Amino acid sequence: MKMEEAVGKVEELIESEAPPKASEQETAKEEDGSVELESQVQKDGVADSTVISSMPCLLMELRRDSSESQLASTESDKPTTGRVYESDSSNHCMLSPSSSGHLADSDTLSSAEENEPSQAETAVEGDPSGVSGATVGRKSRRSRSESETSTMAAKKNRQSSDKQNGRVAKVKGHRSQKHKERIRLLRQKREAAARKKYNLLQDSSTSDSDLTCDSSTSSSDDDEEVSGSSKTITAEIPDGPPVVAHYDMSDTNSDPEVVNVDNLLAAAVVQEHSNSVGGQDTGATWRTSGLLEELNAEAGHLDPGFLASDKTSAGNAPLNEEINIASSDSEVEIVGVQEHARCVHPRGGVIQSVSSWKHGSGTQYVSTRQTQSWTAVTPQQTWASPAEVVDLTLDEDSRRKYLL
């Protein structure tokens, strides 16, 4: 609404009076090329409405400031005081520098506003064209910084209307002092918040770098531990055949921790069975020897001479064999059953086949394995019974499913 009224007044004044043109020509010599171009457009075709509508808001405010600066020296104080009252009762967001879109602009403009009212008073009393020159200079600076928004325009209109009369500016002096204090406090708060945020960012970045350093060192320590565990695994089974160790490390699960867990499980089962081996009967011993022979015949990793050689190698060889049973997928179905138990249960699983082999297929083993040499079954007390082996296999399968 204010802008439309101002444009109407400007058109009337430009058609009737010539001094605004002269004052603008004087200021145009001091300004840069953009202001000169605007003054030339005013001289050539001011009456053309399309040219006026095509010019930016900057030209309209230039005309309005020049016309109002001349009107202020001739007219009374009533319309200006009314306008000042309007602008003073406006929103506080218009007064605070943070309302503008550009923070750097707001700081510079607020510092410039503090110095301008005294200069404006002397300029209004002496020469009205000086005020228009100062306002034109500030506007050209604004247009160069490309911060011509509606908030800026309203703020500038309020300032130009405030500076047209000395008494109005003096009345506003007390309020502007409070406003300066408020602006200074707001600026201090903003700077403190920005400094705090910067310090927080610095702290977080350093803590992140420390964390990354710690994680890298811990990961290197973990790598060392893993490599050490793999070394201990390979050092634990030097007596076994090298094919078994290579098969465990590469062909099946290549994770050294999993192999280590398998090793521990197998060792625990073997220790349990060696503790309780005194109370076993001869039937269980026979079943254990049959399972050992079956595993030797099917897997083909161990030879009977190696098993019968000494006790320590026999303590290590079952360890490798049980790791094979636990970690390889192809031998889960082969645990002590193969063709004899499948004759009884063609579609049965591991537990059914082993139980049937325990109860009903002893005669089959006697009839089919008569030619087999039984010298390979000398260290059978260190072996686990088929039930423990099957339980270990099933637990290992479920554990691997959870891992995957």
Swiss-Prot record:
Residues 202-226 are annotated as: Required for interaction with CSNK2B. Residues 1-50, 63-255 are annotated as: Disordered. The modification Phosphoserine is found at residues 66-67, 143, 145, 147, 327-328, 330. GO terms for molecular function: transcription corepressor activity; ubiquitin protein ligase activity. Residues 1-12, 23-32 have a biased composition (Basic and acidic residues). Keywords: Coiled coil, Isopeptide bond, Methylation, Nucleus, Phosphoprotein, Ubl conjugation. Its main location: nucleus. One of its GO terms (biological process) is ubiquitin-dependent protein catabolic process. Residues 175-200 form a coiled coil. Phosphorylated at Ser-67 by AMPK. In skeletal muscle, phosphorylation is induced by exercise and seems to increase muscle contractile function. It comes from the Eukaryota. AMPK substrate important for exercise capacity and skeletal muscle function. Required for normal contraction-induced signaling. (Microbial infection) Upon Epstein-Barr virus (EBV) infection, suppresses viral BZLF1 expression and subsequent EBV reactivation by interacting with JUN and inhibiting its transcriptional activator activity on BZLF1 Z promoter. Interacts with CSNK2B (via KSSR). Interacts with JUN; the interaction is mediated by CSNK2B. This is Protein ARK2N. The lineage of its organism: Eukaryota, Metazoa, Chordata, Craniata, Vertebrata.
